[in-house]
């Protein structure tokens, strides 16, 4: 059901037409932007409560004054309404809802779904088909887990392109960390069993897994399968050893601890996780709030939204009672297909965990606010130095990175008054220019970034920093002029005397030059943005350069065409395997004679190339 926009929306009349069924309601402004999404056990009663004439707080009063229309979706239950509400908040980001910011930056353990699953570290969107375990507190924790997985279960970690083209086992097999499914050294049934056990381990079921392995070991021994029994014994021993090293508290076997701190219209939710008694560390989240949401409301929204995306443990400790706790508990239990308990009145060790999480949430929030305050002060100093009338809301910076003209990459980083906005960073692979021409590279990057903004009516920065002197600045200025963009302030950041930090010169589009000095907060802000652009550019350049060099080594050898190159890489499982081979071994590849093998070996090892006469490239 939906009401179309009206000058004075009659919410009371709209509510009277609703049913008493559970569902989700949405409020829209006159420009059709979404203001708020809410759930209701009874739509008529809940929606009507907004328009019953009773006094409302400032946030609600402001929101309701903007409502031009509403619509609703009826659901079968209030629990279903809760799930739909979470999905809509995540996908639509309504202005007045508490919203959990995306946590794509946190790393996961990925176990792919394919005939021969691989296990690997994953960060970013979940585009790969598989199970994602986590998120973990950091990359180190993921690598420790992967190390255990390889030792215990010998699952592959190689990319599919390498896996499909190997003809002999890799080093991981030689050191006992992979079962070499790439060359059929493990039966499919045995590999799938290892995958199943690894899944149990990652789900926090190591005790159950240990009992299962012990039972299988006893069965193998009774059946006189002593070799299999010995392998299972070693696996069980490794598992027990790992448990003894990492066990923290048997009573915290599968547990999350959540605490919420609020201050100055901002909030921090701190998550402390235990899985199978192992402390996985803490993660901090800063939900988007409206300044008037209570800590209880923020924590309730966090629990609903976070566990809609991540598998909940059986027990979740909260530092305070939250609204709709029973409903949220029921919804989480139904989705997880096991009982999930939300608790806040706890004693003993668990009370200690809550106290620890609460203190850390407060400390983390204070640290974040202090950092934001300093960042805002620097942003304000930049505004004053550049003589801008309004606050600097968005700064972008471009930098170019290459090695003697090779693999040129341009970076664009974005900052607002609170710091970096990493989700909006961009890299541009530069092509079609004279190698080493930084001016042309800068112009191409600026044109590509801002042409799209013009075509899609995208956001423009208030200040555009160019890492370079007057030449690079002129190229950026010309590119913007060609696109008809005039309301962006351009600033070139030229290196100072002896390239020393703090001595940079800021070159404006009108030719003026500013030298604010090392103590200037404005220059410190610019340095921070410029250094981040440099880091982002050089990281992209190194990746592109490495990829180009890996693929071009064979292409540079006379007598190696596409078919021979593919045969060589397939035979040796990649360039690393080929480089480790001797001339005689290379010559055994179909289509490669001794002379060509000698040239391949010489090229890969930096030796003088033999004469290529008489060879052709198939």
From Swiss-Prot:
One of its GO terms (cellular component) is excinuclease repair complex. GO terms for biological process: DNA damage response; nucleotide-excision repair; SOS response. CDD domains: GIY-YIG_UvrC_Cho. It is found in: Cytoplasm. The keyword DNA damage applies. PROSITE patterns: GIY_YIG (PS50164), UVR (PS50151), UVRC (PS50165). Residues 207-242 form the UVR domain. Residues 20-98 form the GIY-YIG domain. Keywords: Cytoplasm, DNA damage, DNA excision, DNA repair, Excision nuclease, SOS response. The keyword Transport does not apply. SMART domains: GIYc, HhH1. GO terms for molecular function: DNA binding; excinuclease ABC activity. InterPro entries: GIY-YIG_endonuc, GIY-YIG_endonuc_sf, GIY-YIG_UvrC_Cho, Hlx-hairpin-Hlx_DNA-bd_motif, RuvA_2-like, UVR_dom, UVR_dom_sf, UvrABC_protein_C. SUPFAM superfamilies: C-terminal UvrC-binding domain of UvrB (SSF46600), GIY-YIG endonuclease (SSF82771), RuvA domain 2-like (SSF47781). Belongs to the UvrC family. The UvrABC repair system catalyzes the recognition and processing of DNA lesions. UvrC both incises the 5' and 3' sides of the lesion. The N-terminal half is responsible for the 3' incision and the C-terminal half is responsible for the 5' incision. Interacts with UvrB in an incision complex. This is UvrABC system protein C. The lineage of its organism: Bacteria, Pseudomonadati, Pseudomonadota, Gammaproteobacteria, Lysobacterales.
């Amino acid at each position: 059901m939906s009401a179309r926009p009206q000058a004075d929306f009659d919410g009371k009349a709209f509510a009277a037409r609703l049913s008493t069924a559970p569902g989700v309601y949405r409020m829209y402004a006159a420009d059709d932007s979404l203001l708020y999404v809410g759930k209701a056990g009874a739509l008529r009663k809940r929606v009507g409560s907004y328009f019953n004439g009773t006094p409302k707080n400032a946030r609600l009063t402001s929101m309701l004054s903007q409502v031009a229309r509403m619509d609703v979706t009826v659901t079968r239950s209030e629990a279903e309404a809760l799930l739909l509400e979470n999905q809509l908040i995540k996908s639509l980001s309504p202005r007045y809802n508490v919203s959990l910011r995306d946590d794509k930056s946190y790393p996961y353990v990925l176990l792919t779904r394919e005939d021969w699953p691989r296990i690997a570290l994953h960060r970013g969107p979940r585009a790969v088909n598989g199970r994602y375990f986590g998120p973990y507190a950091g990359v180190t924790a993921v690598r420790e887990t992967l190390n255990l997985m390889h030792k215990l279960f010998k699952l592959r970690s190689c990319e599919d392109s390498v896996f499909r083209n190997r003809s002999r086992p890799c080093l991981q097999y030689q050191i006992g960390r992979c079962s070499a499914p790439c060359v059929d050294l493990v039966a499919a049934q045995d590999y799938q069993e290892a995958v199943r056990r690894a899944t149990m381990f990652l789900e926090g079921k190591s005790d159950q897994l240990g009992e299962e392995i012990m039972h299988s070991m006893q069965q193998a021994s009774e059946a006189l399968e002593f070799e299999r029994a010995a392998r299972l014994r070693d696996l069980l021993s490794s598992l027990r050893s790992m448990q003894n090293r990492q066990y923290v508290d048997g009573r915290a076997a599968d547990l999350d601890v959540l605490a919420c701190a609020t201050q100055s219209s901002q909030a921090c939710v701190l998550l402390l996780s235990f899985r199978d008694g192992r402390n996985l560390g803490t993660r901090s989240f800063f939900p988007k709030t409206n300044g008037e949401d209570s800590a209880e409301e923020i924590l309730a929204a966090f629990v609903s939204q976070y566990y809609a995306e991540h598998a909940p443990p059986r027990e979740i400790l909260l530092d305070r009672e939250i609204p709709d706790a029973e409903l949220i508990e029921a919804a989480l239990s139904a989705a997880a297909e096991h009982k999930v308990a939300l608790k806040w009145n706890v004693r003993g060790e668990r009370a200690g965990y809550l106290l620890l999480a609460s203190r850390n949430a407060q400390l983390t929030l204070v640290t974040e606010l202090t950092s934001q305050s300093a960042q805002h002060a620097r942003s304000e100093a930049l505004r004053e130095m550049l003589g801008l009338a309004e606050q600097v809301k968005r700064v972008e910076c471009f930098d170019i990175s290459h090695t003697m003209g090779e693999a040129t990459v341009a970076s664009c980083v974005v900052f607002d008054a609170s710091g970096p906005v990493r989700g909006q960073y961009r890299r541009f692979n530069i092509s079609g220019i004279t190698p080493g021409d930084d001016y042309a590279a800068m112009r191409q990057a600026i044109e590509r970034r801002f042409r799209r903004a013009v075509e899609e009516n995208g956001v423009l920065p208030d200040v555009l920093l160019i890492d370079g002197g007057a030449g690079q600045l002129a190229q950026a200025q010309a590119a913007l002029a060609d696109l008809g963009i005039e309301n962006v302030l351009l600033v070139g950041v030229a290196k100072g005397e002896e390239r020393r930090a703090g001595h940079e010169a800021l070159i404006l589009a009108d030719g003026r030059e500013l030298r604010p000095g090392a103590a200037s907060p404005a220059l410190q802000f610019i340095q921070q943005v410029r250094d981040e652009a440099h880091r982002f550019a050089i990281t992209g350049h190194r990746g592109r350069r490495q990829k180009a060099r890996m693929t071009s080594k064979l292409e540079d050898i006379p007598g190696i065409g596409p078919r021979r190159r593919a045969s060589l890489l397939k035979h040796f499982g990649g360039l690393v395997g080929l480089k480790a081979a001797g001339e005689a071994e290379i010559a055994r590849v179909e289509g490669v004679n001794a002379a060509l093998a000698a040239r391949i070996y010489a090229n890969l090892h930096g030796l003088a190339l033999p004469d290529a006469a008489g060879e052709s490239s198939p």
